[in-house]
UniProtKB/Swiss-Prot annotation:
SMART domains: Cyt-b5, MYSc
Family recorded in the similarity comment: In the N-terminal section; belongs to the TRAFAC class myosin-kinesin ATPase superfamily. Myosin family.
UniProt keyword Acyltransferase present: no
Membrane topology: Multi-pass membrane protein
Name the record gives this protein: Chitin synthase csmB
UniProt remark on domains: The N-terminal myosin motor-like domain (MMD) does not seem to have motor activity but is indispensable for polarized cell wall synthesis via binding to actin that ensures the proper localization to the hyphal tips and septation sites near actin structures.
Region Disordered: start-end pairs: 1-23, 344-363
Keyword rRNA-binding among UniProt keywords: no
Species assigned in the record: Aspergillus niger (strain ATCC MYA-4892 / CBS 513.88 / FGSC A1513)
PROSITE patterns assigned: DEK_C, MYOSIN_MOTOR
Transmembrane annotation, as ranges: 731-751, 767-787, 1029-1049, 1419-1439, 1452-1472, 1480-1500
Length: 1760
């Protein structure tokens, strides 16, 4: 265990246990002879102080010994020693019962009787009921256990009384395959005994009929070996008698009636289901078996028959059997617990007493776990690993502490590795194939059980087995199990090894001479295989230590025997006792004692008279009073301390004052004693959420609590509050009621089931917002789609010549004839000619999209009458190429078509046939712009005029008349008409058109023969104004897109900033993340390429919550990953939280230590919010939300900055950072916020800090976040491109203005205070006050603070610090896990979209935004807001465009297509330039998902704006005028429940180092003018490792010094182990946990405090520090120098250059020489020298003086 802090009990009674005398070297022969002698005498052999050997057979196990006890040879002294160590040293013990041979009998039950504990009889009854499920007859053992490991875990108080007992299988479970499914086919083997008891004990005819059981040979599972009876050589073996005892035992543990019938039915069903396995089963037999099994198990036979394969049915048998065994164990533990509780209730000594020490809480317990490991391979691996592996467990601790550990030979090391490799899955080693194979099998079992479990009848016994808690799913193998490696790693291990004397089969052993069976070769083989001779030699010579103490603990334990303080005092006392020959060893940090020496000391202690008062070392507060203890242990402990909690041994200080609550004040309501037996090893967090049933007092049957609703309209709340509301809110409420007055409240109350007024009001607000959003969307859609048609009807029903040419496809065949456009797509393929010309594609294709006036000439005699009377008169074409295809010319009349076989022969063909037919294909007019008409007249000399918007062309007429010398036959039109064409060609002659007979008669001729089309009305202002408006918006949008594109271009080389030296807090809020995600995230922070000493991982676990898929609460997972010792139990300390009413009070536990990953060792702080005692029955005790986790850290740093009074939790955090980790919290300058499931790239932190260092105006910064599970599902794939482009377009653009509107909480960094004056930024009062708003009771606030806290925090920073910048840098990179399912994605985007809308409203209202009017960030924000709101309209419009294009119902939307192509084209350019080729595919997937992102998700989100958990503490029951009426159903929050105290006062009261004095305040008064807006500015509080920062106040020397040696306080190392494996038993003060980048300290350096800078006297020239970390000014490991690089800096200069011109060159030179005289020139850098000089001068040198400084440093170095 990581922290084996020893606490003694004064209730010990002596028992002598001397170390056995042994030869100088133990050989296999001497060991064999000794073991034989002990075997013959029936005695155990003690191999070393913690290991015993016994020899047992089934014969010796069934015979009574000299004491009349059965069960074989047992070492009762070993049990007694383990018990004494547990109760005297308050450390968990584990006794491992293992066997070297498979024939050895189990001694589990006999050993429990050997323990000096009162084991309740019900425990042995429970084992009687349990054994048949776990053991089977084999040829080599009549009762062979088929489990991996079975444990009995005793919880005992410090008096040694049993207060808890539970049985548990290990997580590896049972070998059902060997015990049931694959029994060997040879004789002598049976299945689990329980099945034979089932067949032998049918008690009633009704039971026999119901179960319908047959002979054992009828069942495939039992008939393989042909053995159905117990071994005949066992004198008392009878299945029927054993079955009766088995049933009686079941009843005794509460399995009776329906429960027992269900158990028996399940067993019978498994037997019958075995007949349905195998590939050779007949179909009829299979159906019959499934029918029977279905009836017994309450399962549809079709599920077994068709849904399960043969393999599935085998897996089902295995899974159901293990579930059944787990259930029996659960019932057994319940029975044991009930009997124990009854015993404790009737025992006055355990119910509490009034005397000192007589009152013991359930927390005052330690555990003794007896673990039975029947399989020799696993037992061997466990044993030899513990003895011979020097890199783990107690051996590693001893080695690190200076104990000489003899090296292990190569052969032994190979044996250990080989033994471990055989059972690596059982030992939790996940790297081998065995682990992966087991995981596959468990996954397969889970799959089959889920498939079957959901089909089982709801009220059936099997469903209760498989789904004990419906919401948790299948939990087989997860509930009620213990983890073997964790148990071994967190306890002191004792070994009890059983040896078998022969390989002979059991039936050959004689019952008359029990010890006659002895084969020296067989026993010798077992001794050699287990390396027991080497074991004895290794332990007895140097490593046989069974007790270890740290220095102070040892003195505190034995001070009454004359042991003096300090290392010298301890060594002297040991020498006085003669314990210098190996009986005791004083290591670097601990004292190690052999059993004989320890027991001698304990015996002497017992003989001493007891002191008048005995303190309970587990309690803290005013119960810790012991008048006889010395100054380091005899005074009351403060409430915030605990022996097992705080890692700094606060018992070593005289507490001069008590905690505030001792002087009166509000009563603490912290979680007190758990309501169940303390099982230990749970970090002091209790067992809530753990899947182990025996360890879970909060299971459903015990966790009922009243959660009724309070109806404020009919209920009786405690009191009513009235709070003022703003005018804006009043206007909004009035507006909402104006729009929703028609919806009666009673309808919402009874139909909508909204009983609360605030919920109804939120619904009304949501409805109004939805209506506004729909209105915006409707207006946009209407304006884009319909408004243009209203202004300009039929604009899509006209075509110009160019547009006509676009319709030239086979399925889009348009033509124009005499000014009209026709769609002849359905006509052109038809054979429409009655002449010999065939209609073919090649004939018709040339005419597609063309004007065909010349091919369809109207007969002049029909349409120009009375001017033309002869059919021979025709017009000649001015264009010689007018008729490219003469065959297509259509002339009607007998003159032009003399053939009578065609309809063209008829002169009326054009008007009677052609015009009616072509009219059916009419689409609209052919239009020409006025400019085109004019150009035809001026450039082409054509006679075009406009009359009443109609265009006529007389060019061919004039050409024909001129061709025939103006013969009247061809110049047939009146001259008054033709003169207008000649004189006004290209013009509009409407006003000149006369209403005369000539004009009227000419009109028909012009309309049919010379008509060209109409004037393009789409060029009119009414038709163009809408286009111009849309174009202007398009230009603006395109401009924004273009600017975003330009801002995203990063054409330069990737920057490689120099390593930075700022102190950074990595804030990690943890909620429900899984273990893999948490481990990956924490590992990534640890591996950051940043100075390990300058980063702190600050994890805040938001409540005791079990995430989906987890088997324990998130805090336990985090602490397990970080390697915290499960026995560490810090106190729960009060703090203020975000919440309503009493929820403003919360309690938290603080853990600290070092975490190692890939050679990086980083300090961490873990704060677990555990909640008030009244919350412990709730599902989420302590949970207050992510915002509260952020506020907790921000408020702490704010109080550190202002040196303001802190809460007890904050004081403990300060203490852990300042005194344990060794860094003044005020040194931290940045806060990196990272989600727990986010992995950060190694160089990201350095890049973020470098960017902030280069630009002091940056207050917040973020990098790129991508997906780490991009290919996990379709839902993750559609998010990849969105994540990428949202950063490289949106955030890159906003970063240009220094106004990133959302710094994502999953990966961003904030500056804590300004670089120049130290003005607080994110930790300022103004930001915290608004961000910590408790009254989140409106829809707007809910969306701001409950959904989008990260975005709103950025908004607040922008609001209060508009002059600062908020940047995005693409070089910093992190990856996070995106939602993998639709439901999770829907929930996430609901939060994101709604919070975006509400936050953008806030941002748009901010003052001091850069730019003005359309050239401002405000305009961009409004565009983003509108763009977010109208996302559905965008999607609808795109769908509309696709429909129009696909259906050919409108013109091709060229502009829209160009814009879309531009948008995605520019985006493509970005990732192509960045060589992110994969995003081509991701972009395509994203486009395919466009309707999801822009329609489904937004609409769902908008409608779900009021989907919150509203709580029932504070209910808004109405808003009247300028008041909000609130009903409060809560006891309220008493601020006195969180006492506040300044750190200096607290440190002084508790004699702690690190007091900082009033330097900051005195400096403020001295220099004045350094405070703005009540924000403390401290430009002198910077990292003293920064290159150019003023001297830190912590180097100036404060009052209250403790003299040369300072305080006697010696903060110990964090209990967290060096390796991040659970249960690693690192020493309490192990130097394994030092930083890897710091050399080992030697000698006296390893015995002193971490040394906070502020506690050192000015003149001190030498420093001592512990092996954990050097003091903060000595992290580089140079003990003898006097600078911050290698030791303590001199006090700051007495001169002050503020307000003057700064130091002159002489002062600079003098400072350089002084610094160079102090530092180690072999290791110091020029940068460090420059920092030291500036620190000494208390100023930052700039310009010429900076140049002089650099030059002078070089000069001084050259002259040295």
């Amino acid at each position: 265990m990581s922290n084996r802090f020893s606490v003694y009990s004064s209730h010990s009674t002596g028992v002598s246990s001397a170390r056995p005398s042994a030869p100088s070297t133990v050989t296999t022969t001497t060991l064999l002879n000794a073991l034989h002698a002990y075997y013959n005498s029936g005695q155990p052999y003690q191999l070393d102080a913690g290991t015993s050997l016994v020899v047992n057979t089934w014969v010796t196990a069934t015979r009574a010994n000299a004491n009349g006890q059965e069960g074989g040879t047992i070492d009762r002294d070993l049990a007694l020693r383990a018990w004494e160590h547990a109760r005297r040293r308050a450390e968990d013990g584990c006794i491992v019962l293992c066997s070297t041979h498979q024939s050895t009998p189990s001694i589990f039950e006999p050993f429990l009787t050997a323990l000096p504990l009162t084991t309740p009889n019900i425990a042995f009854t429970a084992l009687t009921a349990l054994r048949p499920f776990l053991s089977a007859v084999t040829s080599f053992n009549p009762s062979y256990s088929l489990y991996s490991a079975l444990s009995a875990r005793y919880s005992i108080n410090l008096k040694g009384d049993v207060v808890g007992l539970s049985l548990a299988l290990s997580t590896s479970g049972i070998n059902v395959r060997k015990g049931l499914l694959d029994i060997p086919t040879e004789a002598g083997y049976r299945a689990f005994d329980v099945f034979y008891y089932l067949l032998a004990s049918i008690s009633t005819p009704a039971e026999r009929e119901f179960l319908n059981l047959k002979d054992a040979s009828s069942y495939a599972l039992l008939s393989k070996s042909g053995t159905y009876t117990p071994p005949a050589y066992l004198p008392a073996a009878d299945d029927a008698a054993a079955a009766e005892d088995f049933r009686a035992a079941l009843k005794s543990i509460g399995i009776k009636g329906a429960a027992q019938r269900g158990l028996l039915s399940t067993l019978a069903g498994l037997l019958k289901l075995g007949n349905a396995t195998g590939f050779l089963v007949d179909q009829e037999d299979l159906e019959e078996a499934c029918d029977e099994v279905g009836g017994l198990l309450g399962l549809d036979p079709e599920v077994l028959l068709h849904s399960c394969s043969t393999d599935d049915r085998e897996v089902l048998i295995s899974g159901i059997y293990e579930a059944l065994v787990d259930w029996v164990i659960e019932k057994a533990n319940e029975a044991i617990s009930s009997e124990l509780q009854a015993i404790l209730d009737n025992d006055p000594s355990t119910s509490g007493g009034s005397g000192p020490g007589g009152q013991w809480t359930d927390d005052d317990t330690v555990s003794i776990t007896v673990v039975d490991i029947p399989r020799p391979a696993l037992g061997k691996a466990v044993a030899v690993r513990n003895v011979f592996d020097d890199n783990a467990g107690i051996n590693a601790e001893m080695k690190e502490d200076g104990v000489t550990v003899p090296p292990v030979g190569h052969a032994i090391a190979n044996d250990v590795s080989s033994a471990v490799a055989q059972v690596e899955a059982d030992l939790g080693i996940t790297t081998g194939s065995a682990w992966h194979e087991r995981e596959y099998e468990l996954g397969k079992r889970q799959e089959v059980l889920e498939k079957v479990g959901l089909e089982v009848d709801m009220d059936s016994f099997l469903r209760k087995l498989l789904l004990p808690v419906e919401a948790e799913g299948i939990t087989v193998g997860k509930r009620g199990r213990f983890d073997l490696p964790t148990t071994l790693g967190s306890s002191r291990v004792w070994h009890h090894i059983s040896v078998h004397p022969t390989d002979d089969l059991p039936e050959t052993l004689s019952t008359f001479t029990p010890t006659a069976a002895w084969s020296a070769g067989v026993v010798s083989r077992q001794l050699r295989e287990w390396r027991l001779a080497e074991w004895a030699n290794r332990r007895l010579r140097q490593l046989d230590f069974t007790a270890d103490f740290d220095m102070d603990e040892f003195v505190g334990r034995y001070y009454r025997l004359g042991c003096a303080e300090g290392r010298d005092g301890v060594e002297s006392w040991l020498m006085e006792r003669g314990w210098t020959n190996g009986d005791a060893f004083v290591g670097h940090q601990r004292i190690w004692m052999r059993e004989s020496a320890w027991w001698e000391a304990e015996t002497m202690l017992d003989m001493k008279p007891e002191e008048p008062a005995t303190a309970n070392p587990f309690l803290y507060g005013n119960t810790m009073l012991d008048a006889g203890m010395p100054h380091y242990a005899g005074t009351p402990m403060a409430e915030s301390t605990s022996l097992l909690g705080s890692r700094d041994d606060l018992l070593n200080h005289r507490q001069s004052t008590l905690a505030p609550s001792f002087h009166g004040g509000a009563k603490s309501i912290a979680p007190s004693v758990p309501q169940t037996l303390n099982m230990g090893g749970d970090y002091g967090l209790g067992s809530k959420g753990d899947t182990r049933k025996w360890d879970n007092p909060y299971s459903d049957e015990y966790a009922h609590y009243n959660n009724g609703e309070l109806d404020p309209e009919v209920g009786d709340p405690k009191h009513i509050e009235k709070k003022p509301i703003t005018q804006g809110r009043r206007i909004w409420v009035g507006f909402v009621w104006a729009l929703t007055f028609w919806i009666p409240s009673f309808a919402l109350r009874w139909i909508g089931r909204m009983k609360r007024p605030d919920v109804r009001m939120a619904w009304r607000e949501k409805l109004v917002l939805m209506l506004i959003i729909l209105l915006f969307n409707g207006v946009v859609c209407f304006y884009i789609i319909a408004f243009g048609d209203l202004l300009c009807p039929n604009k899509d029903k006209a075509w110009n010549e160019k547009q006509l040419s676009w319709h030239a496809l086979d399925n889009d065949f348009y033509v124009s004839i005499h000014g009209n456009v026709y769609d002849i797509t359905k006509f052109w393929r038809l054979q429409h000619s009655d002449s010999s010309i065939e209609t073919t594609t090649s004939n018709m294709k040339p005419f597609a999209g063309e004007i065909l006036d010349q091919y369809f000439t109207p007969p002049l005699t029909r349409f120009c009458s009375p001017y033309v009377t002869e059919q021979s008169v025709t017009l000649q074409f001015n264009n010689t190429n007018a008729l490219e295809y003469p065959n297509a010319e259509h002339y009607c009349g007998s003159y032009h078509t003399p053939s009578t076989t065609t309809k063209l022969h008829n002169i009326t063909w054009y008007e009677d046939i052609f015009l009616p037919k072509i009219k059916t294909y009419y689409k609209g007019p052919l239009v020409w712009s006025k400019s085109t008409v004019q150009k035809q007249a001026t450039d082409s000399s054509r006679y075009w005029v406009i009359v009443h918007d109609k265009i006529y062309d007389l060019t061919d007429y004039f050409y024909t008349a001129e061709l025939f010398d103006n013969d009247d036959t061809y110049a047939f039109l009146p001259s008054s008409v033709t003169d207008l064409f000649k004189n006004y060609a290209g013009e509009d002659v409407t006003d000149k058109w006369q209403n005369t007979t000539d004009f009227q008669q000419s009109q028909t001729c012009l309309d049919y023969v010379f008509y060209k089309g109409k004037v393009d009305f789409r060029d009119s202002p009414r038709c163009t104004v809408n286009n111009w408006i849309l174009l202007s918006f398009t230009v603006l949008i395109c401009a924004v897109i273009l600017v975003k594109f330009v801002s995203a271009l990063q054409l330069g080389s990737k920057r490689r900033p120099a390593p930075q030296d700022k102190f950074v807090i990595c804030h990690v809020p943890a909620y429900t993340e899984g273990e893999d995600a948490l481990r990956k995230g924490l590992d990534s922070l640890t591996a950051l390429q940043y100075d390990n000493k300058r980063k702190l991982i600050f994890v805040i676990c938001d409540g005791m919550i079990v995430g989906g898929g987890n088997d324990r609460p998130t805090p336990k997972i985090v602490l397990d990953i970080l390697g915290v010792d499960p026995k560490v139990d810090p106190p729960a300390l009060p703090c203020m939280a975000i919440g309503q009413g009493s929820e403003q009070l919360n309690y938290g536990k603080v853990y600290s230590g070092l975490y190692e990953y890939e050679g990086n060792v980083v300090p961490y702080i873990v704060v677990v919010k555990v909640g008030k005692e009244s919350e412990q029955s709730r599902p989420k005790p302590g949970n207050r939300g992510k915002r509260d986790s952020q506020i907790m850290m921000m408020r702490f740093l704010n109080r550190v900055h202002h040196r303001a009074p802190m809460s007890p939790l904050e004081l403990e955090i300060f203490h852990q950072i300042n005194n344990v980790i060794g860094v003044d919290p005020e040194l931290y300058e940045y806060c990196l916020m990272v989600d727990a499931d986010t992995s950060v790239r190694e160089d990201s932190l350095n890049r973020l800090v470098a960017a902030c260092a280069n630009d002091a105006r940056i207050a917040g910064i973020c990098g790129e976040t991508s997906l780490q599970n991009e290919e996990r599902s379709w839902w993750t794939m559609i998010q990849v491109y969105e994540y990428y482009i949202s950063h490289h377009l949106a955030k890159a653009f906003e970063s240009l203005f220094g106004s990133v509107t959302c710094l994502p909480g999953c990966f961003c960094m904030y500056r804590l205070r300004t670089a120049d004056k130290g003005k607080p930024l994110i930790i300022s009062d103004k930001v915290i006050e608004e961000y910590a708003d408790n009254d989140v009771d409106t829809l707007h606030k809910k969306n701001l603070l409950s959904l989008g806290e990260d975005r709103f925090l950025t908004t607040l920073m922008t609001k209060h610090f508009p002059e600062m910048s908020y940047k995005f840098i693409p070089d910093a990179y992190a990856s996070t896990a995106a939602p993998e399912t639709w439901s999770v994605l829907l929930s996430q985007r609901r939060r994101w979209i709604n919070s975006t809308v509400h936050n953008l409203v806030e941002v748009a209202a901010l003052k001091d935004m850069c730019g003005f009017c359309l050239f401002s960030m405000r305009f961009v924000v409004l565009v983003d807001l509108l763009g977010t709101v109208i996302l559905p309209a965008t999607c609808v419009y795109l769908g509309y465009l696709i429909y129009r294009v696909a259906s050919h119902t409108g013109p091709f939307p060229m502009i829209s297509i160009v814009i879309l192509a531009g948008v995605y084209g520019l985006q493509a350019i970005i990732f192509l330039l960045k060589r992110q080729w994969q995003h081509i595919g991701w972009m395509i997937i994203y486009i395919c998902a466009y309707p999801i992102y822009n329609f489904i998700l937004p609409l769902y989100s908008f409608w779900k704006q009021d989907d919150f958990s509203w709580g029932s503490t504070r209910i808004v029951i109405g808003e009247q005028g300028n008041k909000r009426v609130v009903a409060v159903d809560d006891e309220g929050f008493d601020p006195r429940s969180v006492p506040l105290q300044r750190w200096d006062d607290y440190a002084l009261a508790n004699n702690l180092p690190g007091r900082r004095g009033d330097f900051g305040m005195s400096q403020e008064k001295m220099y004045g003018g350094r405070y703005d807006d009540m924000a403390l500015e401290m430009d002198d509080m910077h990292s003293n490792y920064s290159s150019v920062k003023p001297a830190s106040t912590i180097l100036t020397g404060f009052p209250h010094h403790q003299g040369r040696h300072g305080s006697p306080y010696m903060p110990p190392q964090s209990p967290a182990p060096f390796a991040n494996t659970p249960g690693n038993r690192n020493s309490h003060m192990s130097s394994l946990t030092r930083y890897t980048d710091q050399p080992f300290a030697s000698g006296h350096m390893a015995s002193r405090s971490l040394g906070n800078l502020s506690q050192v006297p000015d003149g001190m020239t030498n420093r001592h520090s512990v092996g954990l970390m050097q003091s903060t000014e000595n992290l580089l490991g140079r003990p003898n120098s006097r600078s911050p690089v290698g030791g303590i800096s001199r006090p700051v200069s007495a001169f002050d250059f503020r307000g003057s011109g700064g130091p002159d060159e002489g002062a600079i030179t003098e400072a350089i020489r002084a610094c160079l005289a102090e530092v180690d020139l072999d290791t110091v850098t020029k940068k460090q020298v420059r920092a030291l000089v500036e620190q000494r001068l208390q100023t930052t040198l700039m310009g010429d003086k900076r140049t002089f400084l650099d030059r002078q440093i070089d000069h001084e170095l050259a002259n040295m």
